[in-house]
Regions:
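Extended, well-ordered alpha-helical scaffold segments
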Residues: 119-122, 179-198, 275, 321-338
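Glycine-rich, phosphate-binding/catalytic loops in enzymes
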Residues: 72, 118-119, 240, 257-260
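ATP-binding pocket architecture of kinase catalytic cores
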Residues: 27-172
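An alpha-helical support segment within catalytic cores of ATP-dependent transferases
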Residues: 6-20, 135-224, 285, 289, ...
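Active-site activation/catalytic loop segments of kinase-like enzymes and analogous catalytic loops
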Residues: 252-285, 298-318
C-alpha cells in the first residue's frame, strides 16, 4: 500500500487521536456516493488494537438529514454487544471529522453471479439472527430503517415521490432526459396505476388493509441495503456483512423482496427460490408474511425502477455522464418489462 497524499494528513491525525498510533500506509478500498473508505496499516503502538483497520469518511448531502455515521457505528456497537461476530467491530468514532474506525476484515467481495446456495443460507441465517435481537438490550434505541415503510400506502407514496423528482429533473433536459420523461408518461405511470390497483385488491382479499401498519412485533431489524454487494467472503469461506448506514426497524416483507429484486444481485431463479422459501420459514412467526411479501413485491419493483434512474436527478448531474444515463435508462426499461410480465404470478413468492 502507498499513502495517499490527499488524505494522509487526516488519517494521521485521526489515528493518532483515536488509537495513539501512526499511519504506516493506506490505500482506498471503496469510494461510494456516500462515503470514502480506506484500509490503513498502523505502526507499532497499542498492541491490543489490530495492525490494520478501516477508516470510513461519511458524506452529508445538502437536504439529507440522515446520520449515516451515527447509524452505522451505533448499529455495529449494538450488534457486537449482543454477540454478533459476522460484522466489523467498531473501534472508534470521530464525529467532528465525519469518520469512524472499524475492524479490517480480510477477504474478497462476493462477485455478482458467483453466490452459492451456502451463501444464500448464510444470508438467511444473518437475517434470522437480527430477528432474534428484536428484544435485546439496546434494541429500544434503534430507529426505523432508512425509507422504512410500514403500510402499503407508504410504499406507494415513496414511489410517487421519487418519480415526481424524476419528472421535474427531466422535463427540460437533454434528449435522453426528454425520452425518459416521455417513457414515464407512456409506460411507467400506467403500469404504476395497474400495479397499485392489483395490490389493493389482492391485499384486501388477504385481509391486509392498504393503510394499516404492520404490528410492531412483526417488524424486524434490517440492514435495509442487504445483499452480496455488501458482503465479504473471508479466507475460510464464511461471510462477513458490511455497510449498515441505513439499518433500523423495517417490514420483513421489504427485506425479503429487496433481496430478490436488487438489480446488482444477479441471482439465478434457483437461488431466488431457495432464499424466498428459507427466509419466509425463518420469519414464520410473522402473521400473513407470505401474502404481504407477494403484495409488496411489485410495489418495490416500481421503487427499484426509480432507483435505477437516480443518475437523472440534479444532485447526481456532476457525477453522471450521458453514456451512464443512457445505460441506466435501458436497464430501467428492461427491469420494468420483466416486472410487468410477472408481478401477478410471482414464481418466487407464490
Amino acid at each position: 500500500m502507498s499513502i495517499s497524499s490527499t488524505i494522509a494528513p487526516d488519517l494521521q491525525a485521526i489515528c493518532r487521536t483515536a488509537l495513539s498510533r501512526d499511519v504506516a500506509a493506506s490505500a482506498p478500498i471503496g469510494t461510494g456516493r456516500n462515503s470514502r473508505v480506506f484500509r490503513v496499516e498502523l505502526s507499532d503502538g497499542m498492541r491490543h488494537e489490530p495492525a490494520q483497520v478501516v477508516v470510513k469518511f461519511y458524506r452529508r448531502d445538502a437536504g439529507d438529514v440522515r446520520d449515516r455515521l451515527g447509524t452505522e457505528f451505533g448499529t455495529l456497537k449494538f450488534l457486537w454487544q449482543n454477540g454478533m461476530r459476522s460484522v466489523p467491530r467498531p473501534i472508534a468514532v470521530a464525529p467532528d471529522r465525519e469518520c469512524a474506525i472499524y475492524e479490517f476484515i480480510a477477504g474478497e467481495p462476493v462477485s455478482p453471479g458467483a453466490a452459492t446456495a451456502e451463501d444464500v443460507d448464510a444470508s438467511v441465517a444473518f437475517l434470522a439472527a437480527l430477528r432474534q435481537l428484536r428484544g435485546a438490550r439496546g434494541s429500544e434505541a434503534v430507529r426505523p430503517a432508512s425509507e422504512a415503510c410500514f403500510t402499503l400506502g407508504e410504499i406507494v407514496a415513496s414511489v410517487d415521490q421519487r418519480v415526481a423528482r424524476l419528472r421535474s429533473a427531466t422535463s427540460a433536459g437533454d434528449d435522453v432526459a426528454r425520452r425518459l420523461h416521455d417513457w414515464i408518461d407512456a409506460t411507467f405511470a400506467p403500469l404504476r396505476d395497474e400495479i397499485v390497483e392489483w395490490c389493493a385488491r389482492t391485499a384486501g382479499s388477504c385481509g391486509i388493509g392498504f393503510d394499516d401498519p404492520i404490528d410492531r412485533e412483526a417488524r424486524t431489524l434490517s440492514p435495509s441495503d442487504f445483499g452480496f454487494h455488501n458482503v465479504i467472503r473471508r479466507p475460510d469461506g464464511s461471510l462477513a456483512f458490511v455497510d449498515f448506514e441505513y439499518f433500523g426497524w423495517d417490514d420483513p416483507a421489504k427485506t425479503i423482496v429487496d433481496y430478490l429484486l436488487h438489480p446488482g444481485m444477479a441471482l439465478d431463479d434457483r437461488l431466488k427460490h431457495r432464499f424466498a422459501e428459507r427466509a419466509l420459514a425463518a420469519f414464520a412467526d410473522v402473521r400473513s408474511l407470505p401474502a404481504r411479501a407477494r403484495v409488496v413485491y411489485p410495489l418495490f419493483g416500481l421503487k427499484w425502477t426509480a432507483i435505477l434512474l437516480n443518475d437523472f436527478l440534479p444532485e447526481r448531474a456532476s457525477q453522471s455522464d450521458g453514456d451512464r444515463r443512457t445505460t441506466q435508462f435501458a436497464n430501467a426499461r428492461t427491469f420494468v418489462a420483466g416486472l410487468a410480465g410477472a408481478y401477478a404470478d410471482n414464481a418466487f413468492l407464490s
